């Protein structure tokens, strides 16, 4: 698949286009231009390194939304075996913006739950652009309860702009469904490891992200509101989104410094979409390390640790003036 480049990546896109053109010429010519191709490839790689070493929060937001970024099912295919999808909330409907089912991770039975966006127009509409309705969150709750019953660890993958704000969703209890999930996750008697793989949009993300360990991919985001939404409220213009992204502190490094996430999983050069298999390999190691941390821990110790972790959120430090 041809890589889609973002606006700020245009210098890289131009170099890559030149490289592709030279490769095409080389295939149809006796002239050896391999040295020039190698030189331009190194230049492109260095340019990518320099660009990605100095990303703004707004640019990170764009990468988190990249249309070719791996979604939940991509990671399911790479990280898990024997996946069997489970459907429906047993109350109203089956919301396809949240997917989940039984699987094995490194041979161990587990439950997998995650947001799922679409790759084309038809699938995006089918998945509601990754914005769950109440029945999606109730499906997630059902699967969490099932995992708890059989003592299975839970892996969740977060990638949503937010919970769907439609009238029907509100009528069916959107806020209640999210709130109930927060309560359920806080009380679960089995480990839950959450990973933010793209957009972590407000309560829509939090509803499957209250974990014993929260991981975050290097170029993903996690925030109470989108930069555009924040800008529209504060400055009455979505054009101020870059400033809003800076103020929101939505990047992995900022959230790690605040203690809101536990680990940052580095991405391949250029983002997860440039090397999905490489990204999956790095994430596999991080998930295995996190799961190992909770194996052998008693239920009481697990829940007490989770409680203390949740209670630590929002604490602040007092400093002397001028410190």
Swiss-Prot record:
It catalyses: N(6)-carboxybiotinyl-L-lysyl-[protein] + acetyl-CoA = N(6)-biotinyl-L-lysyl-[protein] + malonyl-CoA. Keywords: ATP-binding, Cytoplasm, Fatty acid biosynthesis, Fatty acid metabolism, Lipid biosynthesis, Lipid metabolism, Nucleotide-binding, Transferase. Coiled coil: none annotated. GO terms for cellular component: acetyl-CoA carboxylase complex. SUPFAM superfamilies: ClpP/crotonase (SSF52096). GO terms for molecular function: acetyl-CoA carboxylase activity; ATP binding; carboxyl- or carbamoyltransferase activity. InterPro entries: Acetyl_CoA_COase_a_su, ClpP/crotonase-like_dom_sf, COA_CT_C. Gene3D superfamilies: 2-enoyl-CoA Hydratase, Chain A, domain 1 (3.90.226.10). Pathway: Lipid metabolism; malonyl-CoA biosynthesis; malonyl-CoA from acetyl-CoA: step 1/1. One of its GO terms (biological process) is fatty acid biosynthetic process. Its EC number is 2.1.3.15. The keyword Transferase applies. Its main location: cytoplasm. Residues 39-293 form the CoA carboxyltransferase C-terminal domain. PROSITE patterns: COA_CT_CTER. It is found in: Cytoplasm. It holds the Pfam family ACCA. Acetyl-CoA carboxylase is a heterohexamer composed of biotin carboxyl carrier protein (AccB), biotin carboxylase (AccC) and two subunits each of ACCase subunit alpha (AccA) and ACCase subunit beta (AccD). Belongs to the AccA family. HAMAP family: AcetylCoA_CT_alpha. Component of the acetyl coenzyme A carboxylase (ACC) complex. First, biotin carboxylase catalyzes the carboxylation of biotin on its carrier protein (BCCP) and then the CO(2) group is transferred by the carboxyltransferase to acetyl-CoA to form malonyl-CoA. This is Acetyl-coenzyme A carboxylase carboxyl transferase subunit alpha. It comes from Paraburkholderia xenovorans (strain LB400). The lineage of its organism: Bacteria, Pseudomonadati, Pseudomonadota, Betaproteobacteria, Burkholderiales. The gene is accA.
């Amino acid at each position: 698949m041809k890589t889609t480049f973002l606006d700020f990546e245009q210098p890289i896109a131009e170099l890559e286009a030149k490289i592709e053109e030279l490769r095409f010429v080389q295939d149809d010519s006796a002239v050896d231009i391999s040295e020039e191709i190698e030189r331009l490839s190194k230049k492109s790689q260095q340019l990518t390194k320099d660009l990605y070493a100095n990303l703004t929060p707004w640019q990170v937001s764009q990468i988190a939304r990249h249309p070719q970024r791996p979604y939940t099912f991509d990671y399911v295919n790479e990280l898990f075996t024997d996946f069997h999808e489970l459907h429906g909330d047993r109350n109203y409907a089956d919301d396809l913006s949240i997917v989940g089912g039984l699987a094995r991770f490194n041979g161990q039975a587990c439950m997998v739950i995650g947001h799922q966006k679409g790759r084309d127009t038809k699938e995006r509409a089918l998945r509601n652009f990754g914005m769950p309705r109440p029945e999606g969150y109730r499906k997630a709750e059902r699967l969490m309860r099932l995992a708890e019953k059989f003592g299975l660890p839970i892996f969740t993958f977060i990638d949503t702009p937010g919970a769907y704000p439609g009238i029907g969703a509100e009528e069916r209890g959107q806020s209640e469904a999210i709130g109930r999930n927060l309560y359920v996750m806080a009380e679960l008697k089995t480990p839950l490891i959450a990973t933010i793989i793209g957009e972590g949009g407000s309560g829509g993300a939090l509803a499957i992200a209250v974990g014993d360990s929260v991981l975050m991919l290097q170029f993903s985001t996690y925030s109470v509101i989108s930069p555009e939404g924040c800008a529209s409220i504060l400055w009455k213009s979505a054009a101020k989104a870059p400033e809003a992204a800076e103020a929101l502190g939505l990047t992995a490094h900022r959230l790690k410094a605040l203690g809101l996430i536990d680990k940052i999983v580095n991405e391949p050069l250029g983002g997860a979409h440039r090397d999905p298999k490489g990204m999956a390999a790095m994430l596999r190691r991080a998930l295995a390390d996190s799961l190992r941390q909770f194996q052998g821990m008693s239920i009481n110790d697990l829940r007490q640790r989770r409680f203390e972790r949740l209670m630590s959120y929002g604490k602040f430090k007092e400093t002397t003036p001028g410190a």
